[in-house]
Amino acid sequence: MADTKKIKTALISVFHKDGLEELLKKLNDEGVKFLSTGGTQTFIESLGYACEKVENVTTYPSILGGRVKTLHPKVFGGILGRRDNEGDRQQMAQYEIPEIDLVIVDLYPFEQTVASGASEEDIIEKIDIGGISLIRAGAKNFNDVVIVPSKAEYAVLLDILNKQGAETTKAQRRQFATRAFGVSSHYDTAIHAWFNK
């Protein structure tokens, strides 16, 4: 089918690592290349899988105490680039932007941090910027990209991988995108409610 896309490269950046092992094993078995940052990269490598640092792609380090890690044109270009758009493809080649076909990300635990009675400073640090941006980018470009916005979606992707290999249909990618915008909306609503207190 023309709308079927193969997952070749996955960007993985998660706060919660539990439940990720089985999915990583299946993706690795399917020959998917891993890109990651910080603690997630260390976790992936601890399982024995090769994983390229996002910093190697961007040639820019994580800065501002980790506030800026994935926010870079080489990352977002790789997610948002339209594979069927000749202009996008030419620019991706010109600027050496890798295609990213799968984004697995979750968000800093904002609501749990608020509920714990944390200080305003700690709560503000749990307002996710990079993660929410990755979710929105992956969801926007569902024509080409699978977005997994929380660990609740791991089993859904694993089921697809077990049945279809690393191939997804446009309908499946759209379903992931729909749930991703739901995650994004819920998260921003919680932040708005806290600021509105």
What are these regions (language model features)?
Residues 39-109:
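Glycine-rich nucleotide/cofactor/substrate-binding loop typically near the N-terminus or early
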Residues 33-34, 60, 125-126:
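Short, flexible coil/turn micro-motifs enriched in small/turn-prone residues
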Residues 1-57:
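N-terminal glycine-/serine-/threonine-rich phosphate-binding loop
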Residues 6-10, 73-80, 120:
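Short, basic, glycine/proline-bearing loop/turn elements
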Residues 19-20, 87, 132:
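Short glycine/serine/threonine-rich phosphate/pyrophosphate-binding segments
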Residues 5-8, 97-197:
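Internal alpha/beta core interface subdomains
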Residues 14, 83, 148:
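Conserved residues at beta->alpha junctions
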Residues 2, 27, 92-95, 137:
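Structural motif
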